[in-house]
Design a protein with these regions (language model features):
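Conserved mixed alpha/beta catalytic, RNA-binding, or beta-rich assembly cores of soluble enzyme
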Residues: 1-25
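A polyampholytic, Gly/Pro-enriched intrinsically disordered region
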Residues: 84-96
Length: 96
């Protein structure tokens, strides 16, 4: 078990900060490569307590929308988006 980053064609182990609210754009951009996704879904474990406005603004600067939700909801959303053929990346915090 652990946190993962899921791209449309690959999944990678991810070591984000222990607290999702301390996540910053520099924790993410190196994992996106040269082709930034239009959407980043962040599954924060349990119910999100922080709207993560600073991270959202930083991602928007790169043309990436941010959706923050529980990890189970992020998994469901990811599955729907992939079934629709959409491009997105999801970061899933391990559920403690």
């Amino acid at each position: 078990s652990g946190s993962v980053l899921v791209h449309p064609r690959q999944t990678a182990i991810w070591t984000p900060p222990a607290k999702p609210e301390t996540l910053v754009i520099d924790d993410l951009l190196p994992h996106f490569g040269d082709d930034f996704p239009p959407l980043f879904i962040l599954g924060v474990g349990g119910a999100p307590m922080d709207p993560m406005n600073n991270l959202s603004a930083a991602l928007r600067h790169h043309g990436i929308a941010l959706e923050v939700m529980s990890t189970p909801a992020a998994c469901r959303t990811w599955n729907v988006l992939m079934s629709e053929g959409r491009n997105a990346v999801t970061g899933l915090y391990d559920i403690a």
